[in-house]
Swiss-Prot record:
It holds the Pfam family PNP_UDP_1. GO terms for biological process: L-methionine salvage from methylthioadenosine; L-methionine salvage from S-adenosylmethionine; purine deoxyribonucleoside catabolic process. This is 5'-methylthioadenosine/S-adenosylhomocysteine nucleosidase. HAMAP family: Salvage_MtnN. Catalyzes the irreversible cleavage of the glycosidic bond in both 5'-methylthioadenosine (MTA) and S-adenosylhomocysteine (SAH/AdoHcy) to adenine and the corresponding thioribose, 5'-methylthioribose and S-ribosylhomocysteine, respectively. Also cleaves 5'-deoxyadenosine, a toxic by-product of radical S-adenosylmethionine (SAM) enzymes, into 5-deoxyribose and adenine. Thus, is required for in vivo function of the radical SAM enzymes biotin synthase and lipoic acid synthase, that are inhibited by 5'-deoxyadenosine accumulation. It comes from Yersinia enterocolitica serotype O:8 / biotype 1B (strain NCTC 13174 / 8081). The gene is mtnN. It is an enzyme of class 3 (hydrolase). GO terms for cellular component: cytosol.
């Protein structure tokens, strides 16, 4: 089995990259893909860059060049579920765009024309993530993750997202694009991110302060998931 792992930022991939054995690097169009072995599993770790376009382009390169069997999106997210705090884990059941609007043509809010309203995460990967969460004794929420090309920082955008997507657990800037590409390639995926901030008027300050905490927690999760996959053979 080969596992594709995607993080947007240097801080979100550096801890994993440094542990990859027999590491090789592919640089293409602003993306970097690191291949090798981690915790007994063949991996291809993508640093995509921030935002939906970078994430979609990088995921396409990853799937075309490395052909992973599954994809895990790691990194940080802004928590919207009331029980989430910095360092907690959010696991996607589905991902949606919060900034797409073609409702004039009969589509749901967040649904891109010609596409499903949501991109559904793989149930077996969700269960794998949750078994690792239990093993590591972490606090976590399973739910909807919404993506858009904006850092959510303030009452108005937060209220809009919560009103439009009442079940949203977290927001960030890449997961829906990654899920979209995986859907087109028919590649199972899941998003497993750690909370770096609670999306409010001070979230930019929290993000800067706690990104490292979130990166450590999400890395811990990825390593646990890889170890579990290796044991399963």
């Amino acid at each position: 089995m080969k596992v594709g792992i995607i993080g947007a930022m240097e801080e979100e991939v550096t801890l994993l990259r440094d542990k990859i054995e027999n590491r090789q690097t592919l640089s293409r169009a602003g993306c970097e893909i690191y291949t090798g072995q981690l915790n007994g599993i063949d991996v291809a770790l993508l640093k995509s860059g921030i935002g939906k376009v970078s994430a979609a382009m990088g995921t396409t390169l990853l799937l075309e060049h490395c052909q992973p069997d599954i994809v895990i999106n790691t990194g940080s997210a802004g928590g919207l579920a009331s029980s989430l705090k910095v360092g907690d884990i959010v696991v996607s059941t589905e991902v949606r765009y919060h900034d797409a609007d073609v409702t004039a043509f009969g589509y749901e809010p967040g649904q891109m024309a010609g596409c499903p309203a949501a991109f559904i995460a793989d149930l077996k990967l969700i269960e794998l993530a949750e078994s690792c969460i239990k093993q590591l004794d972490l606090n976590a929420v399973r739910g909807l993750i919404c993506s858009g090309d904006a850092f959510i920082n303030g009452a108005a955008p937060l209220a809009r997202i919560r009103t439009t997507f009442p079940s949203v657990a977290a927001v960030e800037m890449e997961a829906a694009a990654i899920g979209h590409v995986c859907y087109l390639f028919k590649t199972p995926f899941v998003v497993v991110r750690a909370i770096s901030d609670v999306a409010d008027q001070e979230s930019h300050l929290s993000f800067d302060e706690f990104l490292v905490v979130a990166a450590k927690q999400s890395t811990l999760m990825i390593e646990a998931m890889l170890t579990s996959l290796a044991k399963r053979g």
